[in-house]
UniProtKB/Swiss-Prot annotation:
Its EC number is 2.1.1.182. It is an enzyme of class 2 (transferase). This is Ribosomal RNA small subunit methyltransferase A. The keyword Transferase applies.
Length: 276
């Protein structure tokens, strides 16, 4: 596979994190994993040159219910519009600022499926942005750097377990579905890739916790990974009775389960409500 940044007459732009999927066997496997169904509301993030877009449109789109796509590169937008016409509704702009909820069906039931080969340089911020729209999402299937996927699905007590693990596992059921080697892309990235499936928990399955407080605690806990929690969470010892929670501070952040972090965040919310 050539290392050229040019593919189908388009130069991949580093600032957009562009690596175009070109392996048809991998493309077929990804589409089979997604399992698109005609008439579903689906949006693709970063369609690029349309490698996934074409088979998705063939399975899901109608003129009345097109596939949606969010694309930042205006050169690609023109090509995609010309190629797919009314079967693809393009939204020009940055996925980090896009209101994905605007594509959901009216009402509160999950109705939107989100897919994409996410730009690796913004993957974590984009995953956090997408959490905002989880209540209207059926599922998400993303191509990401393998290292990021490993962190997303990591178990407590492993080196890969991180702030990203806790915050996403609190909101989604996640599974690593496929490995994708660098030679599947043009130009080939310097890292291995993988497909992850993310299914939001239903409202009745979610713990009753303020995600802002949970994020505050988890960020503090992982701020210095090698230090014990009695140091990183020391500022909370005056407001939270860790002993009453059975929460051992003589551990590192990676050794604490998602449920335990949720329990501490709930305790913090109670103390702050009393203080008010």
């Amino acid at each position: 596979m050539s290392n050229s940044r040019q593919h189908q007459g388009h130069f991949a732009r580093k600032r957009f994190g562009q690596n175009f999927l070109v392996d048809h066997g991998v493309i077929d496997s990804i589409v089979a994993t997604i399992g698109p169904v005609r008439g579903q509301r689906m949006v693709e993030i970063g369609p690029g040159l349309g490698a996934l877009t074409e088979p998705l449109i063939a399975r899901v789109a109608t003129p009345e219910s097109p596939l949606h796509a969010v694309e930042l590169d205006r050169d690609l937008i023109g090509r995609l519009q010309q190629r797919f016409g009314a079967l693809l509704e393009l939204h020009a702009g940055d996925a980090l600022a896009f209101d994905f909820g605007s594509l959901a069906a009216p009402g509160h039931a999950p109705s939107l499926r989100i897919v994409g080969n996410l730009p690796y340089n913004i993957s974590s911020p984009l995953l956090f942005h997408l959490m905002t729209f989880a209540p209207v999402v059926i599922d998400q299937h993303f191509m990401l750097q393998n290292e990021v996927v490993e962190r997303m699905v990591a178990e407590p007590g492993t080196k890969a377990f991180s702030r990203l693990s806790v915050m996403l596992q609190y909101r989604y059921v996640m599974d690593k579905m496929l490995d994708v080697p660098p030679e599947s892309f043009q130009p080939p990235p310097k890292v291995d890739s993988a497909i992850v499936r993310m299914i939001p928990y239903a409202p009745h399955e979610l713990p009753d916790v303020d995600p802002v407080l949970l994020g505050e605690l988890v960020t503090a806990a992982f701020s210095q990974r090698r230090k014990m929690l009695r140091n990183t969470l020391g500022a909370y010892r005056d407001t939270i009775d860790f002993d009453a929670l059975g929460f051992d501070l003589a551990r590192r952040a990676e050794d604490v389960s998602v449920a335990e972090y949720v329990g501490v965040a709930q305790a913090l919310a109670r103390t702050r409500n009393v203080a008010q």
